[in-house]
Amino acid sequence: MTRIIVVTSGKGGVGKTTSSAALATGFAKKGKKTVVIDFDIGLRNLDLIMGCERRVVYDFINVINGEAILNQALIKDKRTEGLFILPASQTRNKNALTKSGIDRVFTQLVNMNFDIIICDSPAGIESGAVLAIYFSDEAIVITNPEVSSVRDSDRILGIIASTSQRSSQNFKPIKEHLLLTRYNPKRVSNGDMLSTEDVLDILRIPLIGVIPEDTSVLKASNQGTPVILNYNSNAGQAYYDTVNRLLGINCPFRFVKDEKKSFLRRLFRR
């Protein structure tokens, strides 16, 4: 059974595309045939983070418009077996995405035996975001531990509940997951950032992962490499933990405590 997962947020700049690339790579590393689709029409970025921008010949809109077949537009990742990228178009016409066109593409992907379809959604409520949500079975809501980001995520949860295909057909609701990015335990301890508990108290959806603030994320993006492939980075390890949880594997949350304060507490207990 193919899982269609939208990666979304209420605002831009929270690490949506970085997370889409990392999670898709992680699923493929786990043996799942995976495709990650860029729904951000006109602002194509996924191909840059995946390092395949020079290999784009046809795109999502070309397939929807019948100007190319799906196999011509799918880009096979050179580093990870079983991983494919479907890039967005650079067109400024946001209306180029249609329900019927997306439905045809998704039907073909299911028939091609893809296990996972990751939809990299644009931020907010533009048409690409709403359509990505409409077709999905699960939603990963990305937020930073900041009040404005969390507030915008609360709004997107309302959209998920009301606009999905599942809600319109009275099916079981979209399964919602929270992914907290750019988390800095030291800043949380200093009162400069919301804690995981604060965010969960506001959004009230299950926490699937906590990605720490890590310079390796920017470095990986600039190199066109999903950060999950940097096995020595904290962010890469946290994304692997997130993939495991999405596959039903229990693992503890790491990188959520201020290690300096934890060390001092242990020291004074002796």
From Swiss-Prot:
It comes from Buchnera aphidicola subsp. Baizongia pistaciae (strain Bp). GO terms for cellular component: cytoplasmic side of plasma membrane; cytosol. Gene3D superfamilies: P-loop containing nucleotide triphosphate hydrolases (3.40.50.300). ATP binds at K11, G12, G13, V14, G15, K16, T17, T18. The lineage of its organism: Bacteria, Pseudomonadati, Pseudomonadota, Gammaproteobacteria, Enterobacterales. Interacts with MinC and FtsZ. One of its GO terms (molecular function) is ATP hydrolysis activity. It is found in: Cell membrane. Keywords: ATP-binding, Cell cycle, Cell division, Cell membrane, Membrane, Nucleotide-binding, Septation. It holds the Pfam family CbiA. It is a peripheral membrane protein. Belongs to the ParA family. MinD subfamily. GO terms for biological process: division septum assembly; negative regulation of cell division. This is Septum site-determining protein MinD.
